[in-house]
UniProtKB/Swiss-Prot annotation:
Localisation per UniProt entry: Cytoplasm
CDD domains the record matches: SerRS_core
Domains as described in the record: Consists of two distinct domains, a catalytic core and a N-terminal extension that is involved in tRNA binding.
Gene Ontology molecular function: any one: ATP binding
Protein residues bound to ATP: 257-259, 273, 344-347
Species of provenance: Corynebacterium diphtheriae (strain ATCC 700971 / NCTC 13129 / Biotype gravis)
Keyword set, alphabetical order: Aminoacyl-tRNA synthetase, ATP-binding, Cytoplasm, Ligase, Nucleotide-binding, Protein biosynthesis
Pathway info: Aminoacyl-tRNA biosynthesis; selenocysteinyl-tRNA(Sec) biosynthesis; L-seryl-tRNA(Sec) from L-serine and tRNA(Sec): step 1/1
EC numbers: 6.1.1.11
General function of this protein: Catalyzes the attachment of serine to tRNA(Ser). Is also able to aminoacylate tRNA(Sec) with serine, to form the misacylated tRNA L-seryl-tRNA(Sec), which will be further converted into selenocysteinyl-tRNA(Sec).
Record-stated family: Belongs to the class-II aminoacyl-tRNA synthetase family. Type-1 seryl-tRNA synthetase subfamily.
Name of this protein: Serine--tRNA ligase
């Protein structure tokens, strides 16, 4: 939810953000008009309440002869107060309705759509193979790590089993991420994967991409596509203590996505699936700390990608490709040899005060005044990392070298083909 104070003081900033996102700038004027009507309705209701209160004092001081007429006037005024309060509530509802149509105000992101990102950095050099590399599914099947056929039999398209060392490889990766998170001051959590509509809406996931979310109609609950949702809802309607610095959580959960808009895309293997596991970082901080925290999350992603030994690049995502809650987002993309391209492994977003304003999460400054907090999120490990790990570390004999950082968890240095 955007800041109405920012809207009033800098409407052109919000208009430009709408243009960068590819959204309608005319919404700015609609919201300004609705906000003005809301403020007028508040003043009108406040004035009538004050008048009614003064009238009550006059009645208490009136003589018995004067009271009947004054009581009649008081009742009439009471009706006017009720009508004014209804108008006030209606005006507020209209403001909220229009406000919910806005994405976050874009900050420093490049203009354009999905293909207009800016590459900020390349790390590592894509490997030159002296043999024809296999894709992750061929490797996963020959090594006994991935079973898509039985996953499809049981759950349908885009489901799979991780088996044997494949399960240990994922658990090792997630455990390594959890350790790194704890070393960097994050509190590990295993949060709910089902959340109420107000939490899903509060995080900005019930907008244009709501068809990507699984909804349990009988229970009025949503399955999360990321633990970001549950971690953002953790402090809903609370005033949190940021006097000792940011509050940092790392959520380990299964995640669920319908992939409704992805028909025909990445149907092979486990790159784009309906269920996967992920360790997600989430930070609450003061708004002025958010940019630095965003870089800190990106640096942790860098460390983790270095640990699993894959070449990658970092991109600055264009405004038109941002989710509604993000003011700016960096993606890290790993090199996938058999696709001859980079594919997204992680993202980290600065959501400024957008989510916390919707979820009413605040903190107090040194004077005791309450302010809306800022929130940020970033992925530290997830199932699709296995795609990059397997393909980049394969050998000519069909084996895969386990990255050194994962060997204590997997218990092997090399994964050998099953005979």
């Amino acid at each position: 939810m955007i800041d109405l104070k920012l809207l009033r003081e800098n409407p052109d900033v919000v208009r430009e953000s709408q243009r960068i996102r590819g959204e309608d700038p005319a919404l700015v004027d609609q919201l300004l008009e609705a906000d003005e009507k809301r403020r007028e309705a508040i003043k009108s209701a406040d004035d009538l309440r004050a008048e009614h209160k003064a009238f009550g004092k006059k009645i208490s001081q009136a003589s018995p002869e004067e009271r009947p007429a004054l009581l009649e006037g008081s009742n009439e005024l009471k009706s006017r107060v009720k009508a004014a309060e209804e108008a006030e509530a209606e005006a507020l509802a209209k403001v909220n309705e229009i406000q919910m149509l806005f994405g976050n105000v874009v900050t420093d992101a490049p203009a354009g759509g999905e293909d207009d990102y800016i590459v900020l950095e390349h790390v590592g050099t894509p490997r030159t193979f002296d043999f024809e590399p296999k894709d992750h599914l061929d490797l996963g099947e020959s090594l006994g790590l991935i079973d898509v056929k039985r996953g499809t039999k049981v759950g349908g398209a885009r489901f799979y089993y991780l088996t044997g060392d494949g399960a240990f490889l994922q658990l090792g990766m997630l455990n390594l991420a959890a350790q790194k998170a704890r070393e960097n001051g994050f509190q590990l959590m295993i949060p709910p994967v089902l959340v109420r509509p107000e939490v899903m809406s509060g995080t900005g996931f019930l907008g244009a991409h709501s068809d990507e979310i699984y909804y349990l109609e009988r229970d009025d609950l949503y399955l999360v596509g990321t633990s970001e949702v549950a971690l953002a809802g953790y402090h809903q309607d609370e005033i949190i203590d940021l006097s000792d610095g940011p509050i940092k959580y790392a959520g380990w959960s299964s995640c669920f996505r319908r992939e409704a808009g992805s028909y025909g895309k990445d149907t092979r293997g486990i790159l784009r699936v309906h269920q996967f596991d992920k360790l997600e970082m989430f930070v609450y901080c003061k708004p002025e700390e958010a940019v630095a925290q965003h870089q800190a999350l990106l640096n942790m992603e860098r460390e983790m990608l270095a640990a699993v030994e894959v070449p990658y690049r970092i991109i600055d995502v264009a405004g038109g490709d941002l989710g509604s809650s993000a003011a700016r987002k960096f993606d890290t993309e790993a090199w996938i040899p058999t696709q001859n391209t980079y594919r997204e492994l992680t993202s980290t977003s600065n959501c400024t005060t957008f989510q916390a304003r919707r979820l009413r999460t605040r903190y107090r400054d040194e004077s005791g005044k309450a302010h809306t907090a800022a929130t940020l999120n970033g992925t530290l490990a997830t199932t699709r990392w296995l795609v990059a790990i397997l393909e980049n570390n394969q050998q000519a004999d069909g084996s895969v070298i386990v990255p050194e950082a994962l060997r204590p968890f997997v218990g092997k240095e090399v994964l050998e083909p099953k005979k």
